[in-house]
């Protein structure tokens, strides 16, 4: 009985610690490499979460050669909220990236939408809301 309980606890812990990276379905919608070839800006969608589930669009900036992390987002406080859509990425030059998008402006999203990354890796990120 003790062995059964320990095995059950271990299984619950392992299942609870499974990586979202392995279980999420990510679709890369747009990828643009910076003019100097050092960075990649990506617009993507992500779905997962099992029975409760989630689906969202967001943007990511990473160094060339790095794997994209779908939770390392440039838009929003809560990364799995469906707050943004129609996301476009465009390099203005080596150190300036423009992200344009539509956002959900309902009161429930006000706090979430107030968080937007303005700089990463020395690249200035310019946000253009298209509503």
Question: Residues of each region from the PLM?
Answer:
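Sec-dependent N-terminal signal peptides
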Residues: 6-9
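N-terminal export/targeting and maturation segments
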Residues: 17-68
